[in-house]
């Protein structure tokens, strides 16, 4: 078995890069590509194999399974997007049982902040500012009715990545 702090950190950095792609896609098109979520899922076993940290992967799989079942239920009820549910489950796989509760709290707080912005006049001010800076994509995202919750999930994923990087 190949164990390396550097390889572990590279796998976590790839996780972060994939989260950024998911968030950007969610902001631009309100879609999180299945290929990105699949890449995040397939990268996890690589991390488990190369990290010198002790990973409780069976319980991480249990957290993932619970998250995907609950998330798909919420998606079927029209409460949560399917892409968001899949991305959250993938992030919680990486989080495992130890980091999952705090990761969910971070996602909820950031999601709440985004919701507050989307429900107030602040979004129009921010949209105008982004438009004047030449970022029409961000401006349009702020003026849309949908909320890119993948951004909040990505913030939770950043916490997971930070925790994993600092634990080895």
Placement of each model-derived feature along the sequence:
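A membrane-topology feature that recognizes alpha-helical transmembrane segments
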Residues: 1-168
């Amino acid at each position: 078995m190949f164990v390396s702090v550097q390889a572990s950190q590279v796998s976590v950095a790839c996780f972060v890069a994939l989260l950024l792609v998911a968030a950007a896609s969610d902001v631009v098109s309100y879609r999180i590509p299945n290929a990105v979520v699949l890449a995040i899922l397939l990268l996890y076993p690589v991390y488990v194999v190369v990290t010198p940290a002790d990973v409780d992967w069976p319980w991480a799989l249990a957290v993932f399974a619970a998250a995907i079942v609950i998330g798909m239920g919420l998606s079927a009820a029209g409460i949560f997007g399917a892409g968001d549910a899949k991305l959250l489950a993938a992030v919680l796989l990486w989080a495992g049982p130890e980091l999952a509760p705090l990761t969910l709290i971070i996602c909820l707080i950031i999601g709440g902040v985004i919701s507050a912005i989307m429900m107030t006049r602040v979004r129009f001010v921010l949209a105008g500012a982004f438009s004047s800076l030449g970022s029409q994509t961000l401006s349009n995202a702020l003026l849309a009715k949908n909320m890119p919750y993948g951004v909040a999930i990505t913030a939770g994923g950043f916490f997971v990545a930070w925790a994993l990087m600092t634990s080895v």
